[in-house]
Amino acid sequence: MKTLVLLSALVLPCFQVQADPIQNTDEETKTEEQPEEEDQAVSVSFGGTEGSALQDVAQRRFPWCRKCRVCQKCQVCQKCPVCPTCPQCPKQPLCEERQNKTAITTQAPNTQHKGC
């Protein structure tokens, strides 16, 4: 039964093509060549100005910038124009002020880091 259905599904289009040959008349080709008013470029946006929930979830799951791959948990030091870098991140070299702060931390624990 399955082979009969499959065979008929393959043979039926062949018979339809032979029975109804495609003939283009001058009127059909003229109407097909004319551009319609419906063929216009349309811009569709699914996000708002506040961002989407998927982006928020992605930022919580991967808390680093996709461009520079650094941590966004600590927002003290601004090295990347896209995202803040984490001073504890081993991938990023520390600026001179941050190095001095880590060296002086035992002497003056209330020192604030002003940025790089």
Swiss-Prot record:
Region Disordered, as annotated, extends over: 22-44
From which residue to which does the signal peptide run? 1-19
* Positions of the UniProt region annotated as 3 X 3 AA tandem repeats of C-Q-X: 71-79
Compartments annotated for it: namely: Secreted
- Specify whether Signal is a keyword of the entry: yes
- Give the start-end ranges of region 2 X 3 AA tandem repeats of C-R-X: 65-70
Q: Is DNA-binding found in the keyword set?
A: no
Name used for this protein in its record: Alpha-defensin 29
The species this protein was found in: Mus musculus (Mouse)
